[in-house]
Structure formats: structure tokens, C-alpha cells
């Protein structure tokens, strides 16, 4: 119904009256074409859909982002846009990804294994160095235990 709203609606918008403008700006910066709110999501390409979702996350005002495979469906330009957004993001982020290029840009890698959750300082390259050193130390300890 036009012109009517509930008190809860106003509470949700408190401090976010410019959300439409901020989202429109984010869409332009992400090189998304203008589209209306009534356009069905399935009519967007995979890359457009991912960028639109990411724009929403970045303008949400959240303190922390939880992103699952955020580079999926993005072309090179879209991935570069995302890398820039993450570099300038002031909040925290937990990102699940298999994208090595994205992981090399992260300041910390957290590995989830069947038995543990392990945190490694540094990007993906540093993570690989640390894992290799751990594996070599484990092999040496095993050889020492056997002899």
C-alpha cells in the first residue's frame, strides 16, 4: 500500500534514508547496468547477480561480511572490482574461496580440515610455506620415532 508504513519499517530505515542512492552508486561503480527493482533476478547474468549481491553487502553498513566464493561468475574486470572493494573495506570479513588470486590478497588464511580449524598469518603463499614446513617437521618426527 502506497504512503503507509509501520513503525518497524521506519526503525529499519533509521540512518539509511540514502540507501537507494548508495546502492545506485555502488552499481555504477561495479559497472552494472541500471535496472529496476521489479526486474526478476533470474534475468541477470551470473556475474551481474554476484556483483549486485556484493554491492548490497558492501553498502549494508555491516561490521562484518561473510562471503562464500565471491569471485564465482565474475570476469577479470569483476574480480578486480571485488579485490579493490575488499582492500578498501573497513570492517571484518570471513571469505570462503578456492580462488588462489583472491587468497593471495588475504592477510590471514584459516584452514578447515576434518579434525581442526587452523589459522595461518599471511596470505596464501605464506600459508603454503607454513604448511610445507609443518609437513616436513611431521615427517622428520615420524622418521625419528621409527629409528
Question: What are the language-model segments listed below?
Answer:
Residues 1-142:
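ABC ATP-binding cassette signature C-motif
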Amino acid at each position: 500500500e502506497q504512503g503507509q508504513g509501520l513503525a518497524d519499517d521506519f526503525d529499519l530505515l533509521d540512518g539509511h534514508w540514502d540507501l537507494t542512492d548508495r546502492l545506485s552508486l555502488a552499481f555504477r561503480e561495479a559497472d552494472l547496468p541500471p535496472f529496476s527493482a521489479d526486474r526478476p533476478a533470474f534475468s541477470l547474468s551470473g556475474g551481474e547477480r554476484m556483483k549486485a549481491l556484493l554491492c548490497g553487502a558492501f553498502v549494508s553498513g555491516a561490521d562484518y561480511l561473510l562471503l562464500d566464493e565471491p569471485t564465482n561468475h565474475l570476469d577479470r574486470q569483476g574480480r578486480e572490482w571485488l579485490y579493490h572493494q575488499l582492500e578498501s573495506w573497513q570492517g571484518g570479513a570471513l571469505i570462503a574461496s578456492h580462488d588462489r588470486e583472491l587468497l593471495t590478497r588475504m592477510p590471514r588464511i584459516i584452514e578447515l580440515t576434518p579434525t581442526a580449524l587452523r589459522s595461518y598469518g599471511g596470505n596464501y603463499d605464506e600459508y603454503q610455506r607454513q604448511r610445507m614446513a609443518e609437513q616436513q617437521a611431521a615427517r622428520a618426527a615420524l622418521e625419528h620415532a621409527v629409528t
